[in-house]
Amino acid sequence: MDDDVDAGEIYAVDRQREEGSASAAAFSRSPSTGRVDDDDDDLLTYGRSARRMAALPAPAMPEGTELRRPVGGDVVGDDDYLRFLYKFKELFDRVGIKLPTIEVRYKNLNVEAESYVGSRGLPTILNTYANILKGLANTLHMTTRSKQKISVLHNASGIIKPHRMTLLLGSPGSGKTSLLLALAGTLPSTVKVSGMITYNGHTMDKFIPQRSAAYVSQHDLHMAELTVRETINFSAKCQGVGHHYDLFLELLRREEEENITPDPETDIYLKAATTGEEKAEIVTNHILKILRLDICADTIVGDNMLRGISGGQKRCLDAHTAPNVDSAAEMLVTLGRALFMDEISNGLDSSTTFQIVNTIQQTIHVLGGTAVIALLQPAPETYELFDDIILLSDGQVVYSGPRDHVLEFFKSLGFKCLERIGVADFLQEVTSRKDQKQYWIHGDDTYRYIPVTVIAEAFQCFHVGQAIRSELAIPFDNSKSHIAALKTSKHGVNLKKILKANIDREILLLKRKSFLYIFNALQLTLVAIIAMSVFIHTNMHHDSIENGRMYMGVQFFGTLAIMFKGLAEMGAALANLPVFFKQRDLLFYPAWTYSLPSWIIKTPISFLNTIIWVSITYYVIGFDPNIERCFRQFLVLFVMSEAICGLFRFIAALTRHPVVASTVSEFCILIVMVSSGFILSRDEVKKWLIWEYWTSPLMYALNALAVNEFLSPSWNEALPGFREPLGRLVLESRGVFPEAKWYWIGLGALLGYVLLFNILYTICLSILTLLKRNVREMSQETLQIKLENLTGYDQEPSSGGRVTNDKRYTEGGNNDEATSSNANHNSSPARKGSILPFVPVYMTFEDIRYSIDMPKALKVQGMAGSRLELLKDLSGSFRPGVLTALMGISGAGKTTLLDVLAGRKTSGHIHGNITVSGYPKKQETFSRVSGYCEQNDIHSPNLTVYESLMFSAWLRLPAEIDSMARKRFIDEFMELVELFPLKDALVGLLGLSGLSTEQRKRLTIAVELVANPSIIFMDEPTSGLDARAAAIVMRTVRNIVDMGRTVVCTIHQPSIDIFESFDELFLMKRGGEAIYVGPLGQHSCELIKYFESIEGVRKIKHGYNPSTWMLEVTCTLQEQITGVNFTQVYKNSELYRRNKNLIKELSTPHDGSSDLLFPTKYSQTFVIQCLACLWKQRLSYWRNPPYIAVNFFFTVVIALLFGTMFWGVGRKRQSQQALLSAMGSMYSTCFTLGVQNSSSVQPVVNIERTVFYRERASHMYSPLPYALGQVVVELPYIFLQTLIYGVIVYSMMGYEWTCTKFFWYMFFMYFTLSYFTFYGMMAAGLTPNYTMSSIVSTTFYAIWHLFSGFLIPKTRIPIWWRWYYWICPVAWTINGLVTSQFGDVDDKFDNGVRVSDFVESYFGYNLDLLWVAAMAVVSFAILFAILFGFSLKLFNFQKR
């Protein structure tokens, strides 16, 4: 048995399996446990049978005993699984119980959406504001709608019957996903739906569609920190047998009545499906084995930044964490479940796809399930597993019926599938205008394009279409619907168990993220120590009102420090929202069972943070020593922390966007801070804004803290000339209610806010949906092609931007010219691209080994060694003009090998020799001549397709290539991969907006091709593409190879034609070992000859796909059956020796050759890199309304709010308190706007950073030009923000209108916002994710607050901390603002002191040193910008 571990996987060694009597013995020895729901009514109704079920023994089998392994197992094969299914069904048949089934009907189903067409759909700042105004005008019926209606599905009709597998085919964009969503009842409310959909004759309002059907999305959404086992286990715990319990109960009752002895194997399985806590574990293990995920069960799922399982394994995981499919009971005993699965084969090899589909097919056929599965490139053997076909094209159903009649239908239209072309490929191409002609059987002279609408109409006249129409006319007999088929309850498990599952997961996530919380606590400890030493009790006395205000300042600072620490909660909440919305919509759980654990489980963190703060600061600073008052302070701060965390969670759920959430959160911090009663006392708040004071949680916290402290015995002494105690005077001077009851009022209000914010959080989670564009903006070219395919006529855009029919060809006309030109276009080589020179290179690698540090999970399991080896002694060569396929089952290590060879690994240990053209590989030069198409399509979301290609070509093509040649080169490859219709389409974020999956894949390929590389690595270039698009891509790749380039591709599901377009094959098996490296030969003859010569390997069938056969005969199961170690067979072969000789020959430089050498490190100069990066950032920012537009909106709101709250404060100079209020306005405004800029820019940096990692690995540019581009693009937006804010606030606050004072105000605000923005960039650059950057930055926000000069003047800062005052950027901002506005004012206060003298004596500000403050703020902006650049240069947080 092979104990090795795959790339990205942790291998869980399979336990020995026992059968028959061992299973029965395990059952008899298992302890007793309760069933899912203990219902006394069942006991009364069913008597002894119910008691048997109520005390079902949990099938907790001893080690070495498991449920039978279904298809794809290491021991038990397809026949065993099928036998098990028949045996299971026999349980019900022999007692006369009919299993529930579902028949889905849809009639005249139409789905329409509205979308902007062309540039109007780009999310620019102007378009965003225009859309808002347009929406308001539409609401008031002042204007007409400018969106264009798009028909997604048109008059779709059909019947999906039980016991039959239905394959949904269609090119991307044809409406497959919309049809599946409509049938599953999960279409978004933003689209218009008409027509009828019924389940067993019942409309969807009569049952719960999400519980009666399961939709599996094509996008992988999982919590990256959880392991595969934990992900499936959670899914299993949230699902249940539900109504099927009664069905099983009836089965047992009838068995007892008829004295039938249960079969041990099926009886164990039945009990596993109906027991309580043990069910999830058994179900999880079963699913892991069904999907071949047991080898990576204890590996975290991972994401783009966190290394985890492979892409194919994620697809398997996604396919079986959908509701109703995730438990073994529901997978094997579908019992009336309707499955709708969307492109589940993406990233899977053809063998794994076949095994999974075969498992589903056997289940559907035997147990009467209903399934519709959309596949893009099904292999012929996978295609044969289906009974029915639904073929969509441009929203039209062109065929829906038995698979046996589909070729007959198209033959009646004059089309025939060609030899060696898969039927599925033929069906997807025959409706395409560019591919239809090749299948015409009556000669080219008679051909004219038959549009989609004509084919759809012809199907209605075909006998299959007529039969469906006739059957739909007869209503379904509702009496035939099984009572257990359609679910009327929302959840399959009682809410108590669902809540427990969420609590367990939340605790698990808390442990996985413990470093973040520990780091957060350590930083709070640091801030507390600093505050303690600044406000040390030896400098803090209880002898004056001024010192009393200092103590209130400490309390204010403490609340701010704890409040800023709560910001980390928002980042964590945002990160989990996509997974939450997916699981909520699929009815895994109600929102409250998610929100309650996320609140309660985090409570100890708030408790710990509060203890840290109070224990460090309380007694050292000199608060009242009474232990009760210490506890009271702790209680207020703890409850306030809980309220603030609830507020930030609520903001995250409300905004659902990291950038918008950051902006809104800072706005809320501003409101609660300014309205707290500290910056402006209650007496100074305007009457019309007093509501803000009464609604601020911070006000209640400060009131409670102040009353607790200043009504204590420590403040009971009266000052000379006053009768009232000093503490009472302090409270009255700041407008605090001097009554003891206000402690309890404040605490009660905070508790109310805790409940309010968490209730609002739950409500938002319950009613809102994930922010995404349900209908992507459509380019005019795309809409034009869609209409041309539908009608057969050329389309012309009207003057208003709408595409209208232009009948350039009559119905009887011949459009051979257009069609033939398209056909020629598709097959033409890259003639224009070939004019660009390149240096052919070849690569050899010998004895490559790659290992990582042993994961903790495996150490716990007892695996020895300090490292885990993922690649083992791999050797091979890639040569110019040779197209090499790198293949193996999912998780074999293909991507890992590509990463190692391309130099993309950022961690782990690599051993072995790699040469390029005979010389040792140097990564810097190799990156210049290589391209890497990554499996994850990572692009800048706010660029268009053409701009993305332009940026890549601009920075990667040699500097001597002029712009016109570069443009021609780009256009050539856009034509080759058919991106011209998408030229002006926005790339967007995967799964949320912009391009579809297959469009992004083509863009990924084009981005690398336009760099004109000599050697290209392609990781699954055809994954996510339909057969036609895959053929286009591979045709393009073949053309590139024929030019003399070296290309190696990992590929999963090649058709025969695509597979045989490769020249050589590098085949790997699990464990990272090679089992075949050599030529394919004509019709794969060399490959077939090699494997058929091995004893025990079955012969390939005639017409069978060699790639599928190859994976089948070399799988782990076959190795165990035949006893053949394919790795050892290869190493003992003559082929291996020939390869070693070839590697030895190619590893030596040829005579007259020279090593790769470039005069410069990058293709373009530093200046060009800066210009290109600035060009890209300018476009990205202009199309980023959540960042720019929202920022401007809140800037205006904050300016008006502050101007109102501090109205005329600049003219009030009659008292020191008035000046302090003016200073408070400056302090709060610069901090609020600054922190808003700093926080909102961090998600922007993080989103683009994944793209930056890819581009830097390609040596497109140095990190410094990238950083400079992002810094410079901010400057005009900051200037506009400063201008908007400055003009509003300066005039409303009544500062003196002189050119000098206004200039200095704008100057300091501009550079303050600049250094805050650049600080946010730097924080993001120095940390791995948004949550961590929030923790780091908020720590410095708190310290800057402390040393800003407002809470404690410079003159009163202890000498040992005064040095930090000089390096605190905010201190220089406050210095500059106060000095420029009041440093030259000769007016006197009521006590006779001049304003300028007070500014100098109290604050230590000197007008003569104003230029120093100006230089300081400029220096900080430059410093943070430089540090941002170096953070990108020095740190790489991508784990690969």
UniProtKB/Swiss-Prot annotation:
Cellular component per GO, a single term: membrane
Protein topology in the membrane: Multi-pass membrane protein
Transmembrane segments: 516-536, 561-581, 603-623, 634-654, 659-679, 688-708, 745-765, 1188-1208, 1219-1236, 1271-1291, 1302-1322, 1332-1352, 1357-1377, 1410-1430
Predominant location: membrane
Single GO term (MF): ABC-type transporter activity
Residue segments, region Disordered: 1-42, 794-829
Intrachain S-S bonds: none
Biased composition (Low complexity): 21-32
Polar residues: bias regions: 812-829
Residue span, ABC transmembrane type-2 domain: 497-710, 1168-1382
UniProt keyword Repeat, yes or no: yes
Superkingdom in the source lineage: Eukaryota
One Pfam family per UniProt: ABC_tran
Entry's localization field: Membrane
Key words of the record: ATP-binding, Membrane, Nucleotide-binding, Repeat, Transmembrane, Transmembrane helix, Transport
ABC transporter domain mapped to chain residues: 137-419, 843-1095
Repeat among keywords: yes
Amino-acid positions noted as binding ATP 2 in the UniProt annotation, renumbered to this chain: G888, I889, S890, G891, A892, G893, K894, T895
InterPro entries, per database record: AAA+_ATPase, ABC2_TM, ABC_trans_N, ABC_transporter-like_ATP-bd, ABCG_dom, ABCG_PDR_2, P-loop_NTPase, PDR_assoc
Protein residues bound to ATP 1: G170, S171, P172, G173, S174, G175, K176, T177
Family affiliation: Belongs to the ABC transporter superfamily. ABCG family. PDR (TC 3.A.1.205) subfamily.
PANTHER family attached to this UniProt entry: ABC TRANSPORTER G FAMILY MEMBER 39-LIKE, PLEIOTROPIC DRUG RESISTANCE PROTEIN 1-LIKE ISOFORM X1
Stated role: May be a general defense protein.
Protein name listed in UniProt: ABC transporter G family member 46
